[in-house]
């Protein structure tokens, strides 16, 4: 018997994406997500009225209780579109994509829009100017929360205050260095060589916050403007939170695409 052709209703595809960046105006995360979502939807206008679910990644910037609902309203989505926000976790963007693919494969979802944003630059600027925070709509019922709600650390970490990522990841890095027989300065060189190609991509990317190519030496060498943040990481090796950026993507079935 010949193999059965795959059901296009159950084959998940990523069909569109959008990004947003703001360096000047003061914005909130929903403002940025609107821009990113509109950019993604512009690539597939026929799917705008077919979105079944709108998922928003948890936001660190202070926002109202229902950013997904606020975003849905600003995008013109009807009440039939499911709105949700995730728990806290760096894994949640990929988890949302994986769950969307699984739901499409199971035949329970056709089109979903996934979005996330931070506006920490704007939040800090407002505070510095003595302005009130822009939390968006604050009079909405809270969005449903999805995802793993377990804390990201256990009693052992709490007991020794090993909580912030900038303390946790350097610990891993030092273990890797020790296993490889490398001192901290040699490990910095390895990390610099790993990260330098990413800066080359960023230098040509219109939505990169830092659009400068750096050499491995630039990244790995401690200097007054590239201080050691937590051994062995220099400042240029650490995550930067003070940006205003957003991204969105649309996952749908092959049939919908």
Name the predicted role of every residue range.
Residues 94-102:
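Conserved phosphate-binding catalytic cores of ATP/NTP-utilizing and phosphoryl-transfer enzymes
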Residues 1-86, 101-106, 113-256:
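Conserved "HGTGT" condensation-loop signature of ketosynthase/thiolase-family condensing enzymes
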